Amino acid sequence: MRLAALAPLFALVCAVSGSSQKSGEPLRPEWCRELPRPAYKELARVDVRGNWFEVYRIRPDVYAIYEPHQFEEVISYLIIGQRRALLFDTGLGVASIRDVVTQLTTLPVTVLNSHTHFDHTGGNAEFSDIVNEDTPFSRKNAEGQSNIYSRDALAPERICGSLPAGVRPEAYAIRPWTVSRRIHDGEHIDLGGRALEVLFTPGHTPDSLSLLDGRNGLLFTGDTFYPGPIYLFTPETDFVAYTKSVARLAELAPRLKLLLPAHNVPVSEPDFLIRLDAAVKSVQSGSVKFTVTEGHREYSFDGFSLLLSEK
């Protein structure tokens, strides 16, 4: 997820190398030049069919399913136990994430979303077992999201390379899905030999949650933290709730070995939570300066920034 994703006219200022661009090739926006991110060179890539997703083995039976060709650089996670597997987010829905999952496991798969923004629920409709929070925000989003809302995600300036065959931006929309069961804060999901604790962490959205694998020291943070500009400016964002959620996660940092965020790179150090907690407190107190960027207040810190509405 990148700051320039906020600019509706980004295509007009996007730098494309005309001298090296061959006729008929997809345009390569400026942000494509940053790929691949250096962190991915240190990870074990797993070969899968198709060109839209890249899969990386993060830990035994923990896979990051990465969408590098779209501006948000969304990352979903497949966590495999002895009896079943859990898919934490389903990405943009541009290509079939289910096809990727079935290449990695033959076990039954339960879907749990870190929150219900469209870039994390695009593949939900491919699955029959979906557990989720019960909030008005999540119930509304389960009805699907129209092309009017999501089509900009596939605008040329937000795509690096080519879309999968048959995908048309003007037809792209998020299909509705059915929730099998509602979950609760503190609930444990037993996959068989691996238990995951659900932690409600509202703020980015009312239904944001994180997922803790306490035994292995892994915390899946969703959009509560990722290394990059963290979006906290949408109407559904509650910054006060966000600060409380961050404080909750920061208390876990000494027990953790790894953070697994939902954008950009799939591995971050737990110390980021301590720094994030200090950052949001400095924003609350007014002790840190900001810049105005594309109509938002941006508070910059080492390794991430916070984007709030300009009020």
Region spans (language model):
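Conserved beta-strand hairpin/beta-sheet module of binuclear metal-dependent hydrolase folds
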Residues: R49-Q103, L211-Y226
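Accessory terminal helices/loops
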Residues: V13, G18-V46, G228, K244-K311
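Active-site HxH/HxHxD metal-binding segment of metal-dependent hydrolases
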Residues: V94-D190, P227, L276-K289
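Short, hydrophobic/aromatic-rich segments at coil-to-beta transitions
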Residues: R59-A64, G186, A195-E197
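Metallo-beta-lactamase
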Residues: A85, L92-G93, Y172-I174, R181, ...
